[in-house]
UniProtKB/Swiss-Prot annotation:
<dbReference type="InterPro" id="IPR001296">
    <property type="entry name" value="Glyco_trans_1"/>
</dbReference>
<dbReference type="GO" id="GO:0005978">
    <property type="term" value="P:glycogen biosynthetic process"/>
</dbReference>
<comment type="function">
    <text>Synthesizes alpha-1,4-glucan chains using ADP-glucose.</text>
</comment>
<dbReference type="InterPro" id="IPR013534">
    <property type="entry name" value="Starch_synth_cat_dom"/>
</dbReference>
<dbReference type="Pfam" id="PF00534">
    <property type="entry name" value="Glycos_transf_1"/>
</dbReference>
<dbReference type="InterPro" id="IPR011835">
    <property type="entry name" value="GS/SS"/>
</dbReference>
<dbReference type="GO" id="GO:0005829">
    <property type="term" value="C:cytosol"/>
</dbReference>
<dbReference type="Pfam" id="PF08323">
    <property type="entry name" value="Glyco_transf_5"/>
</dbReference>
<dbReference type="GO" id="GO:0009011">
    <property type="term" value="F:alpha-1,4-glucan glucosyltransferase (ADP-glucose donor) activity"/>
</dbReference>
<keyword id="KW-0320">Glycogen biosynthesis</keyword>
<keyword id="KW-0328">Glycosyltransferase</keyword>
<comment type="similarity">
    <text>Belongs to the glycosyltransferase 1 family. Bacterial/plant glycogen synthase subfamily.</text>
</comment>
<keyword id="KW-0808">Transferase</keyword>
<feature type="binding site">
    <location>
        <position position="15"/>
    </location>
    <ligand>
        <name>ADP-alpha-D-glucose</name>
    </ligand>
</feature>
<protein>
    <recommendedName>
        <fullName>Glycogen synthase</fullName>
        <ecNumber>2.4.1.21</ecNumber>
    </recommendedName>
</protein>
<comment type="pathway">
    <text>Glycan biosynthesis; glycogen biosynthesis.</text>
</comment>
<dbReference type="GO" id="GO:0004373">
    <property type="term" value="F:alpha-1,4-glucan glucosyltransferase (UDP-glucose donor) activity"/>
</dbReference>
Length: 477
């Protein structure tokens, strides 16, 4: 079974979000599972520099200009690169300029990505062609459409990492992207009078996956579907929509081997986690005290992530004696709010604006509770890292958060399945009630340690996801 992942980023070469983490880990897990998985990416500068052994496979003149297809390896995974400097050789973000405006030629930049993905199934590399083209998010959404236009030389899977991003472009660009105008209708890639790369993936793929079972159900409902509910309900009825939970890359995220921690530990040596907490308190300007629970946030600061709820509930958390360490950036109003809280509550609130991968490891190793109060969350990786590190997640019951964290209710504690704290309603009162329950458990150290061990024993490895995808691919054949 030969599978080509078509996507726009890959950790650690280039990362703007969780998609990169998935592509950085899933193909390697699939190779270990017996699938010949490779990755197709635009040759953005950071990616091109990282694939040092790239060799020319093919050269083509396309609707988007001349391209060179390269092939090399990164971490023993085969990587195809679309080398088109006029489209991809730009500094900074792969999607927008330094003023945060989307590049005006994004329609060509990402149509080309989908086109090359489909051409791979028609022999663009004469020595390797995929049985399945697996496209990820709107950037690769046209790949299934190009495959359909070519008579489907390979099966296609389209994975939704976040349905909110739809890849919308003006209709006249149908003249530019080498797809038949007949594809531009409601039973195709048209959405609200425009081209939607996301809808193209949803409509033309042989199978759709979303990144958690609960999110898969949610996206068939108007609240979460952004107008796509009719199509997704139809795909669900046809048996062409399913959920595969993302995993954790244990080579990068493991407290036993994490060299970014001051003190490494396992579920059997949890006492060694205390030094990480002490170092984190020092680094964030917090009072060094192992008797108080240290809550943490590592997140984009947006209302989607529920960080306004954290700000509203913060006085209640601090009144009970807790501390907060925050690492993130985003909405300027939220940034200012957290910075003001740090100034008002020195020693109890520490804030670092920005994102630093290494420091996120130190927070995960040192905190007691990781807050993930998202209004919606397709899968979420932060709570999985928390589970792995014995940093109990406090989450809202939505998407992948609902699938991965079991509340510390009396019943779950008795059954030995409790792994964190879960609240229902997207408001500060509901969040604060969950925070209070965290304090109650904190007051019983032996029970807290028991739940930590339960959390750290859970298996969210990529091997589980790789097996699920392999079974899906074979069903499509």
């Amino acid at each position: 079974m030969q599978v080509l992942h078509v996507c726009s980023e890959m950790f650690p070469l280039l990362k703007t979000g969780g998609l990169a983490d998935v592509i950085g880990a899933l193909p390697a897990a699939q190779i270990a599972d017996g699938v010949d998985a490779r990755v197709l990416l635009p040759a953005f500068p950071d990616i091109r520099r990282g694939v040092t052994d790239a060799q020319v496979v093919s050269r083509r003149d396309t609707f988007a200009g001349h391209i060179t297809l390269l092939f090399g390896h990164y971490n023993r995974v085969g990587i195809y690169l679309i080398d088109a400097p006029h489209l991809y050789d730009r500094p900074g973000s792969p999607y927008h300029d330094t003023n945060l405006f989307a590049y005006t030629d994004n329609v060509l930049r990402f149509a080309l990505l989908g086109w090359v993905g489909a051409e791979m199934a028609s022999g663009l590399d004469p020595f390797w062609r995929p049985d399945v083209v697996h496209a990820h998010d709107w950037h690769a959404g046209l790949a299934p459409a190009y495959l359909a236009a070519r008579g489907r030389p390979a099966k296609s899977v389209f994975t939704v990492h976040n349905l909110a991003y739809q890849g919308m472009f003006y209709a006249h660009h149908m003249n530019d992207i080498q797809l038949p105008w007949s594809f531009f209708n409601i039973h195709g890639l048209e959405f609200n009078g425009q081209i939607s790369f996301l809808k193209a993936g949803l409509y033309y793929a042989d199978h759709i996956t979303a990144v958690s079972p609960t999110y898969t159900r949610e996206i068939t409902e108007p609240q979460f579907a952004y107008g796509m509910e009719g199509l997704l309900q139809q795909r669900h009825r046809e048996g062409r929509l399913s959920g595969v939970l993302n995993g954790v890359d244990e080579k990068i995220w493991s407290p036993e081997t994490d060299l970014l921690l001051a003190s490494r530990y396992t579920r059997d040596t949890l006492e060694d986690k205390a030094e990480n907490k002490r170092q984190l308190q020092i680094a964030m300007g917090l009072k060094v005290d192992d008797k108080v629970p240290l809550f943490a946030v590592v997140s984009r600061l947006t209302s989607q992530k529920g960080l306004d709820l954290v700000l509203e509930a913060l006085p209640g958390l601090l009144e009970q004696g807790g501390q907060l360490a925050l690492l993130g950036a985003g909405d300027p109003v939220l940034q200012e709010g957290f910075l003001a809280a740090a100034a008002e509550y020195p020693g109890q609130v520490g804030v670092q604006i920005g994102y630093h991968e290494a420091f996120s490891h130190r927070i995960m190793g040192g905190a007691d509770v990781i807050l993930v109060p998202s209004r919606f969350e397709p899968c979420g990786l932060t709570q999985l890292y928390g589970l792995k590190y014995g940093t109990l997640p406090l989450v809202r019951r939505t998407g992948g958060l609902a699938d991965t964290v079991s509340d510390c209710s009396l019943e779950n504690l008795a059954d030995g399945v409790a792994s964190g704290f879960v609240f229902e309603d997207s408001n500060a009162w509901s969040l604060l009630r969950a925070i209070r329950r965290a304090f109650v458990l904190w007051s019983r150290p032996s029970l807290w340690r028991f739940v930590q061990r339960q959390a750290m024993a859970m298996d969210f490895s990529w091997q589980v996801a790789a097996k699920s995808y392999r079974e899906l691919y074979y069903r499509l054949k």
